[in-house]
Amino acid sequence: MEDLIIISNLNDFIFCPASIYFHKLYGSQDNLLYQSSAQINGTKAHETIDEKTYSTRKSAMMSLDVYSEKYGLCGKIDLYESDKKRLIERKKHVRQIYDGYIFQLYAQYYAMTEMGYEVKELFIRSMDDNKNYKIALPENDPDIQQKFEQLIAEMRTFNLETFYQTNIEKCKNCIYEDACDRSLNRGE
């Protein structure tokens, strides 16, 4: 059996595959030692979902563990509104919709449908301004669906030993930059 891919790692892998390694390395440390203020704020904003206190509506399912056998993915959903058959991925602040956000939502979608839930709508919600962004279902966006499957294939064959980051902006914005021997930002 192949190793399971954690759904949240889909977005992390796109940003920088090495960040997943560092996240696991520092994972047991106090996050104040290595997380940026934006990440700490995002984690804090997510507490109501993780603690299942975001809503008291019976139709609101929060922080549900999910698994997709087809894609070998596991993780948690943020919010499923069973009365509307709506799956929602919440983000602290959305400036633009990145592919990684969509891929996380697709992974949750496949896991939910494999587990027997009906999902008719996908949304990304920006928590700071309460804006909702409707995302096409995978079957209605074959290009993004293909990119999703390609990303999973890349993750399964990835070799950290041969990886070198090519985007200096990612290094400049990485919380692990000081610890990373692959950073393009050395000496600045």
Features from the language model and the residues they span:
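Short beta-strand-loop-alpha-helix junction that forms the active-site gateway
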Residues: 90-98
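Short small-residue beta-strand/loop micro-motif enriched in glycine and branched aliphatics
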Residues: 86-90, 132-134
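Metal-dependent nuclease catalytic cores that hydrolyze phosphodiester bonds in DNA/RNA
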Residues: 1-87, 103, 185-188
